[in-house]
């Protein structure tokens, strides 16, 4: 026959273009609750899996899992679609599946890549029995706070100029809240603290925040605090100082054993206990308001000031503290670190540093069971009473240890320890690249979503690399690249991980998104601070916020983004929050989009389908069986007409369907003024303004008459 004699390439073109005989665009399934229930099954659960086709368009559909073929039953017909179902029972092991569709002589396949003429194992759907991500995280609106730059609620705990010596100079107290951070600003302190966070909880609640993610808060000599000095205590400089003294360093003195004021502040048990108590009170108040809080866990490395190392000899003669590993070969912490020269004590400087940084000693887990137990105790302590934090964000989590095998072993133990103490605590990892091997239900819950959110969004809308280090014309407005990147990287995230993934536009490691809208390559060191806000386009920022608030996952606002803060990458991205000088339009827009995100749960847990795209243009839908939200983006600098295939979200192809506009943003501002748009035969015709973003909504009862 004709089909049987075709070459493979011709068969592929034949299959993909033979509509209406076989409508590939109508085929759909995913891992959401609308196409797989339960979404996160346990061993022994019966799982119902669904598949959608065009009505009366296929002969049969088979669910293929682990080599077994199950013919699916047509469960129902709704509108223009048929829905097929099959059930499988979960065992202990991973289940992989895909769909095989037959129509006449044609056979095609459906997996996480969509329709294909050839089955590939690497793109099959996967279910890990027992994989569970806390429900409260899924779709939660998160807010990241870099504490020193957010709000100064207690000036009495401010770091003083000359209080101690760190990386080439003494600490600096910045008196001007609006001053731009210095290029080498790691030892600059603006005075933000936990009392300031407490004072602004009304603001965060009004904004619509569900979860507060705090950058590190433990004792540390830097403002970023990724160089931990004491994992058991909140830094009194952002907590409470109840015992103080004189004793700043003399000019030219770099010996921190003379830094008496600093030593008193960070080693006196009364200060440490008072600071922990303040943190406890903060968490209690956050919980009282119905919000959650996540801490930053920096467990790959610590700081050279750390009491286990004590390179600065801060703890050497303090009552109640053991000798640090730098100080003495007999230190109980010697095995916590790897020393290259065993003959250099006392004061041995030959320890391994993370990326060779001597201020960041690499923790030597494989050689110290005691270190492993200690860090596991830290993980348990802060999610347990009386602190009761709601989870951990794990810094450079894949770097921990010296081998992949140990890394996975440790995170399994960490998860077991944390979840036993607080089953609803979340474990969220910083990770670049494919996280799949950590996301199998026994290590991390989810990740900071760089690959499947931040990077594709910034390339598409701005053409900029996320540090503002590169501009690429070939990726600016390239919707095909955006869709390809999203589909590819989302395959690595199972539904629970995707629902809880931290979807950020900016953070403490990358340039502010608003700065990226000026398409300018630059850093503070050579471009200057003013260049970060020159030529910015707030309308593109609003487009990004629309995506952020309508994409599966947990939209995470980096403090100040909502207020219009600009900045190149670290340290310029750590400017202070501009209290009283916010970009009010940008702030109000964030509030309104957060309201939309929270009012329509399908934005957090619905199915996602791309509906239309071209250069500088994109549309996608979030939908269930009875509800649809369509997002349309025009990133061009001129108005244009756009035709969107709304029927792919499940609306009728035969009857007119009314969509209500929830939001329209453009270069002129934004409006929530209601307006009705009619999808005729499943097609929406929309005139989109320049740099426009539109959000449309339809429920089954809104059918146009």
What are these regions (language model features)?
Residues 305-310, 379-380, 386, 411, ...:
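Conserved alpha/beta catalytic core and glycan-binding cleft of carbohydrate-active enzymes
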Residues 1-139, 143:
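Glycan-association/targeting regions that enable binding to alpha-glucans and other polysaccharides
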Residues 55, 676-705:
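C-terminal beta-strand-rich structural cap/linker in extracellular carbohydrate-active enzymes
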